[in-house]
Every structure is written in C-alpha cells, then in structure tokens.
C-alpha cells in the first residue's frame, strides 16, 4: 500500500489550550552529541547493531562530481572568433556597441526628481505598502490564537513517520500545518492530555502516541522542533530477550504494538492503553509505571475509552469479537462481557446518555448498548466493510458519524434509538482509517485515510444535515465532577450515572 499521504490517527485540541507563542528548541553541541549517543545505545540494546554495507562512493562517481564542479576553462587561442564574441549585426540590433558610452547630460536631472522621495526603514512603516511580506505571514501563522483549534494527526510517509500539528480556525477560514514532529515508529493512535508529571502539579498541552512498538511516547505540543518526547511509558524488548523467549511482565508494560489510548479526564494521572499483546494497561503517569494490567480478552485489544463522567468505568473492544466493561477499582473481579458478529473496531460512550455506548465491527455493523443490559438497543448495518470511525457530535444529541474502509462517511440520526441515514459521501480518500469530532464545533469533523492527507469537513454545509440537526438544541457538557483520590482510582461517594 502506498504510504505517501496516509493519515492513520487524529485528535483535536480545544481552543485556548495551546500556548500563544510556542517554544522553539535550540540544542547545544553537547545535547546533540548526547542524543546521538543515546540513539546508538538504543539500537545496540535492541540488537540492531548489525552493520549494513554502505559502500564508499565509486571513483567514477567522484570523478563525475569533480567534473561538474570544475570551473569552465578559458577558450584556447585557436577557437573561432565568432564563438567568443557577438558579431556586428547583433551589436547593432541591441545597440550594445554604444553601451559603454556616457549618457545624455539631460539624464542627470533624474537625480533631482528623486530628492522628494521618502525612504522608510521597513515596509511596516510605509503607508503605501499594504501587502505583507512572507516573514510577516509566517510570524502570524506561528502564533496560536485563543480561537484556534489544533488538530494532531499521525502520518506515514514513504520513508518516515511523523506527527503533524495543524491549526484550524473556522472564523478565519484558515487551516494549515503549524509544525511537525518526527516519530521513531509507525503511529497507530493519538490521545490529547493535559497531565504534567512535574512536581508543581501544573497542566500542559501533550499528545500521547501509540505505535508499532510497546512504547508510548508523550510529546509537548507547545514545543516546536523537539527531538525527543517529554516522557515515555514502557520499554522495548531487546532482540536477545526475544530470542530467549523471555516474556515481559505487566510491571514493565506492553510486549507488542499499542493500538489505542484513552486518557482519564477525572483522574488526570491515569492513561489506558490497548495492545496487540491482548492486554489493557492502566498507567500511573505520575510514576511512569503500570498501575494495573487487565487480561480479559483473548486476542488483540483494538479500542478502549474511559467513561466521560465516571473515573472508574472503562470499556474495551477486541479482535476476539467482544467488548468488556470494567470497574477499574477491581477490574479482574468486576467486569462484564458482550459478544458480537465481528471483530470490534471502535467503541465510544454516548455522553448524552451515560448508560449507553456504541461499538462498531469489521463486518460493517454498529451496535447501541445499555451497560445494564445484555441485548443491544439497536443493530445497524451501516457499511460494507470495517467501521474505523465512530464519532458522536460533541454537542448535537443523536448525530452520529461513521467512517469505513469502504471509503464512505455516513451521517446518522440515532435520536430515539431509531437510526436513520441522513447523508452518505465517498470522501475520495481511499480506505478511511480514522475520524474525530471537534470538541468546540459540533459539525466539524476531521478524517484521515489512505490518501489525500488530513481532511476537515463541516457537515452542516449539507442541506439534509441542516434539516435534521440545524434546529436541534446544542448541549455543551460542563466540567466533569472530581473528588479526592487516594490511589490511581478512588472510591466516589456520590451516586454515579452508571448505576441504575
């Protein structure tokens, strides 16, 4: 598959979160040497020290380079005269034979006419220059306004993988790449979080990245040109350990790729990760270590999400065609399972109906479930292929958007538990890998796929969407409730929406 413009995962950052003027990294020679040394050490630890034949440049190639770089030699005396000079006819045609003659004395008055001109120090000071130069535009684009959203996407290029940080501003109709971050491995999932592990208990603007390795990287979005993450969770197994068959313990982290991430907004130091090693790990980011490892699935865990209002409640979906619901205070004893017709691709909580969640499968179905019941509320045959995007509008109740490997995005009205198709569109992006709704703008969605990079679509521009949802009340979620927490998860004294 061509990787030239693949976008594999995407996440939004709310307005007003990012630093207005991001910091730029300026490394000293000593820091560069340290980073190079650490990179070499990691390669050696992973058993990647096998030398590759690079070869020296061939003498013919070096000779060719020298030939191209050699200055042109003067022509020999025996060369014909017309190869070195223009003939008289050409001189006459362009009046070049009089080029060195002094000009008309009347032309000296031109200098007098310039005496009245005003010279400005820069174009900013000249009132007649209304067009801004490139540097001014670059300076303005570098600043992040309070009305700007950030969109962070994982991108797989032909020869490298990176994070792209885009700026989106609906009011100004602007959308551009602000900066990018070079990644060490193929990105599979991204999750925004504001937890800062530093002792001062401040908040930050971070993005956690799951990739084809067991290591989760956490990057600071307020720093441009950074070469290493702020911190990492987990570690890679060296080739020597893999050959010995030594399995990494849950105390160290995952042993395979990290397929999905979910940050707990109520217990801010907790991050959940789903892995191809069949486990879910709850990370205590304040310690940089796993707090718990959940092993209830029998195949790769592809998706998971914390409940938006209940800190201890988590759902996960797996290749084993099941969804698990956990109480993270005692996950092994307190969990519930549902079985489905296909592998689970995505799960998401319905933030308008806290007892309900949605699950999508690789055979094109969407299931709406009540966490207190065994049977689904409805089953929707939504697509002809796996459903990789499953996103409820951030503010419009009943507005569901699905994205699929069948190349289509579909918009559904599921209000009243009777789903109806509102609009369907071929995005011309090939296989669709991911989607996400803007937290501040309920009709703005971002999509990533096999080609055409990152796409942002305002679905309200579709007349049928306007008819279905245009007059529907917008429900803005308030701040989540918090309570004092003694450990990774604390007992909550108040009654929870998940309780019947």
UniProtKB/Swiss-Prot annotation:
**Localisation per UniProt entry:** Nucleus; Nucleus, Nucleolus; Chromosome
Per the entry, what this protein does is: Chromatin-associated factor that regulates transcription. Regulates Pol I-mediated rRNA biogenesis and, probably, Pol III-mediated transcription. Regulates the epigenetic status of rDNA.
State the residue spans of region: Disordered: 38-88
Say if the entry is tagged with keyword Nucleus. yes
* Name the record gives this protein: Periodic tryptophan protein 1 homolog
Matching Pfam families:
WD40
* Disulphide bonds in the chain: none
Which GO BP annotation is one of this protein's?
positive regulation of stem cell differentiation
How does this protein assemble?
A: Associates with the RNA polymerase (Pol I) complex. Interacts with POLR1E.
Give yes or no: UniProt keyword Nucleus: yes
Modified-residue entries (Phosphothreonine), positions: 21, 54, 85
Encoding gene per record: PWP1
Residues found modified as Phosphoserine:
49, 58, 484, 493
Q: Which protein family is it in?
A: Belongs to the WD repeat PWP1 family.
Name the domain of life this protein comes from.
Eukaryota
* WD repeat extents: 185-229, 253-293, 296-336, 382-422, 427-467
What species was this sequence derived from? Bos taurus
GO CC terms: chromosome; Golgi apparatus; nucleolus; nucleus
List keywords of the entry alphabetically: Chromosome, Nucleus, Phosphoprotein, Repeat, Ribosome biogenesis, Transcription, Transcription regulation, WD repeat
Which post-translational modifications are recorded for this protein? Phosphorylated.
Q: Where is the composition biased (Acidic residues)?
A: 76-88
Q: What is the lineage of its organism?
A: Eukaryota, Metazoa, Chordata, Craniata, Vertebrata
